[in-house]
Amino acid sequence: KAIAAIETSGTRIIANPNCRKMLNRGQEMKNSDVLQLADDMKLEAVPAYNTTPGRDKFHPKGRDNGYILTLGGTRIYIAGDTEELNQMKDIDIAFLPVNQPYTMTPEQAIRATQIIKPHILYPYHYGNTDINKVKEGLKNEKTTEVRIRALQ
């Protein structure tokens, strides 16, 4: 339903193999695949998975993707459904999911932000999670602006 709501005849769908199979269309990207979309636009598929014991059944390692979109010199990390992963570096804008049991706790999102050090953080997927905990926990991080948007 979400894709249908915004899709046009020119929409290019890029998905991990599992989602590609469910959609029965689109271009498949696996962890570590890189796609050059234009001269100054690159998309990298990065791992997205649960790390908390007992939660790995929701997003097992190797199945799902997050993405790093590079536009010119700006690197945007869209984490997908994942928990705190320490390997992300040189990120300008980060979109991090905050909603246990499927993604990060507020504390994990705070730690991930402190490691990644993006200029801008957009927490998302937070449902009933008190997202202000993330903003409060990062209030002393002078290099990161936390932007919270109410999305439908």
Which ranges hold each PLM region?
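Alpha-helix C-terminal capping segments
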Residues: 6-8, 19-24, 69, 86-91, ...
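Metallo-beta-lactamase
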Residues: 65-132
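Short, polar loop motifs at secondary-structure junctions
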Residues: 1, 14-22, 30-33, 82-83
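Short, acidic/turn-prone active-site loops that include or flank metal/cofactor-
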Residues: 18-20, 31-35, 48, 98-102, ...
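Core dinuclear metal-dependent hydrolase active-site scaffold
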Residues: 26-90, 104, 150-152
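Short internal beta-strands
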Residues: 10-18, 120-125
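Binuclear metal-ion centers of metallo-dependent hydrolases, dominated by the metallo-beta-lactamase
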Residues: 24-37, 41, 110, 114-152
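Active-site metal-binding motif and surrounding structural segment of the metallo-beta-lactamase
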Residues: 1-15, 90-95
